[in-house]
Each structure stands twice: as C-alpha cells, then as structure tokens.
Amino acid sequence: MSKIVIKERRHMMTISYNKLWKLMIDKNINKTKLREEAGVSSNAMAKLGKNESVQLEVLAKICKTLDCNIEDVCEILFEE
C-alpha cells in the first residue's frame, strides 16, 4: 500500500485513512454507499484506499456524511 510521505526536516510523516475504514465498519456503510451519499468521486475513494493525497473538501464531505470529525477518519503518523 502506498503512503503519503511528507519530509519535514528530520521527521517523516505519513497520512493513514485506516480510521475511516474502521468507522465505516462500525457504521455499517460500504465504499459505494459512502461515495454516493458524500458526493465524492470514485477516483477520490480509490486514492483514499491507497493512502494517497485527497482534497480537504473530500474529507469534509465524508465527515459530514458520517457525522464525525476529521481526526476520526485520518491520522498523521510520525516516523524518525
């Protein structure tokens, strides 16, 4: 699985959407239903599945649909 890698001085950061997939299981919603209800593209969902960069607007739509905050769907992982 590819990751978003951001180099910042001596630290590496990756963005993970694993929280999103867990939340979807908890709320009993699949990717197709989320995509349709949130109004996001198939391309955006595919990028999320590969931990690739997506626009903040996509995450905002998903959060609104799932009635959650952004920290409930993604996290930044710091590596040294």
Which residues make up each language-model segment?
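Residues in the helix-turn-helix
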Residues: K33, A44, D72
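Recognition helix of helix-turn-helix/homeodomain-like DNA-binding domains
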Residues: G39-V54
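Short C-terminal boundary/hinge segments that cap the last helix of small helical domains
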Residues: D67-E80
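A short, Lys/Arg-rich alpha-helix, primarily the initiator
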Residues: S2-K31
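Short, basic-rich loop-to-helix N-cap that marks the start of a DNA-contacting helix
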Residues: N51-K64
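The alpha-helix within a helix-turn-helix
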Residues: M24, R35, C63
